[in-house]
Every structure is written in structure tokens, then in C-alpha cells.
């Protein structure tokens, strides 16, 4: 597509904000925005991340798209209040990373949770009859405890995903995998500590990151306009109070536009995310 304002774009900085838990809705929005940014030939992208992470596959797809785009423009990530786990992974797709001294980041690792309701079901007299093609077809079933072989299978899955995370951080930050593993044990740390560990490049605000992006693109930081690519919300969600999701991450892609209480809206979305990701490996910091 030929954009009528491409000349303006070449003198401006694109901006995308990633907030909330990363899921399918985040991925869809990000990929669409990155495609438009590429077509409009922006020279730089400011990637604002304020997310505790989310699903593994969606985080990986966003990272891959950023990697492809990095050959065509400069990308500077700005870590906000929290940029942990999958939020860190996405940030690895940038050329440079800026964090506030007090940013909560880290939580490099993988978590997988399932629910065991066996005792509750016994109390209410509910049981399930299962017919399956193999011994592991109902792994993480909520009506029974995991067997030792099942725990081994799931641990192997977690270990593979963890190794992928460590390798990406090591390559992006020019660190050895051994060094990354020394602090990639799920712990969180501040932006100041992240700088000491080599996870970020500088300490500073989003404005500092914007100015750096402008300089890298050969633009005047005092004159370069920043164009934000917001989530495209349906008209109803824009008109109804509380109609926007808890964050642009819109955890499961579901929203509750009829609710006028943002806190309740956010709680319902979180519960839906918990339900939909039970038994799914996550790059997510759970406070």
C-alpha cells in the first residue's frame, strides 16, 4: 500500500504501547501495527512496554516481527512500571532498551499451572469416566493428581521453553548463556539492577528513549513527532465508560463493553485469562 503521508512518516517516530498481559489480542494488534509502520517507512520505533508477560507463542511472534523490522528502522524499547518475563522477551527485539531505575523487570523463566479439584469433586460426589488413546492424553486433567511420568514430560516441555528464552536474551544482549542463567531463575529485579546485569542499555524515562530513537534515526529530537499506534477499539467500546480492556493486551481477546466498572472489567478479563491458559506454558510474572 502507498501511504499518502509517507513523507511525514519518514520524519517522525512511530510509537507502540504494550500494556497488560500478552495474549492473542496483543499479538494481532502488534503485527498489524508493525506492518503499517513498515509500509509507511518510519525511520524509528519507540516500543513502550508495561507488561508482566503472557503466553509463549504470542510473545515469540511479536519478537520475530520486531527482529525482521529491525533491519529497516531503529527500535528503542522503554520499560515502564513493569516489564517482566514475556515483556522482557519482546524487548529483546529492540536495538536498545531503556528502563526506569525502579522498573520491575526480570522474571525470566517459564511457568505452567494446572488445577487439581480431585478432593472437591470427591466431596460433592462427582467423578469422570475417561476413555483415551494414550496414557498422557488427559495430562493435567483437573480431576486427578499428576503422575511422576507426567511431571517429567511437563518439566521437559518447560525446560525447552526456558532454553529458548535464555538463548534469545543471551544473543540480544551479547551475553553468554551461562551468564543469563545465573539470573534467569524467575527472580525479579529493578531497572538499575538490570543495567548492572546487562539486560538494558540505559536508565531513563520514556522521553529519554524517544530522544535516543530520534538520534539513531538521524532526526532532531526536539522536532521529531511521535505518532502512536493505538489499539483500534470498536465504537461501542469507545463510547461506553469502562469499555476499554484492562490493557492493550486484552488478555484473551475478550472484552466486556457493557460493564461500566473498569476494576470489575479487569478482574473478569484476568479470570478469563486464568481459565484459558490453565495448563499452558507462560512467560509471565505472577505477583
Regions found by a protein language model. Give the residues of each.
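N-terminal organellar transit peptides
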Residues: 1-85, 92-100, 111-287
Amino acid at each position: 500500500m502507498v501511504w499518502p503521508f509517507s513523507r511525514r512518516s519518514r520524519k517522525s517516530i512511530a510509537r507502540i504501547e504494550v500494556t497488560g498481559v500478552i495474549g492473542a489480542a496483543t499479538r494481532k494488534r502488534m503485527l498489524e501495527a508493525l506492518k503499517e509502520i513498515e509500509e509507511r517507512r518510519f525511520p524509528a520505533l519507540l516500543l513502550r512496554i508495561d507488561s508482566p508477560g503472557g503466553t509463549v507463542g504470542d510473545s515469540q511472534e511479536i519478537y520475530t516481527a520486531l527482529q525482521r523490522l529491525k533491519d529497516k528502522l531503529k527500535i528503542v524499547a522503554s520499560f515502564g512500571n513493569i516489564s517482566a518475563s514475556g515483556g522482557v522477551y519482546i524487548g529483546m527485539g529492540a536495538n536498545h532498551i531503556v528502563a526506569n531505575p525502579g522498573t520491575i523487570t526480570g522474571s525470566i523463566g517459564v511457568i505452567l499451572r494446572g488445577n487439581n479439584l480431585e478432593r472437591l469433586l470427591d466431596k460433592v460426589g462427582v467423578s469422570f469416566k475417561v476413555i483415551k488413546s494414550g496414557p498422557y492424553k488427559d495430562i493435567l486433567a483437573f480431576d486427578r493428581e499428576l503422575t511422576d511420568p507426567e511431571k517429567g514430560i511437563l518439566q521437559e516441555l518447560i525446560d525447552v521453553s526456558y532454553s529458548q528464552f535464555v538463548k534469545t536474551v543471551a544473543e540480544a544482549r551479547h551475553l553468554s548463556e551461562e551468564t543469563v542463567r545465573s539470573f534467569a531463575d524467575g527472580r525479579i529485579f529493578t531497572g538499575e539492577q538490570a543495567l548492572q546485569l546487562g539486560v538494558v542499555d540505559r536508565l531513563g524515562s520514556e522521553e529519554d528513549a524517544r530522544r535516543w530513537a530520534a538520534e539513531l534515526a538521524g532526526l532532531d529530537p526536539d522536532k521529531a513527532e511521535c505518532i502512536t499506534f493505538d489499539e483500534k477499539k470498536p465504537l461501542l467500546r469507545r463510547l461506553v465508560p469502562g469499555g476499554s480492556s484492562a490493557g492493550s493486551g486484552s488478555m484473551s481477546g475478550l472484552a466486556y463493553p457493557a460493564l461500566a466498572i473498569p476494576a470489575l472489567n479487569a478482574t473478569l478479563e484476568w479470570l478469563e485469562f486464568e481459565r484459558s491458559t490453565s495448563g499452558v506454558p507462560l512467560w509471565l510474572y505472577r505477583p
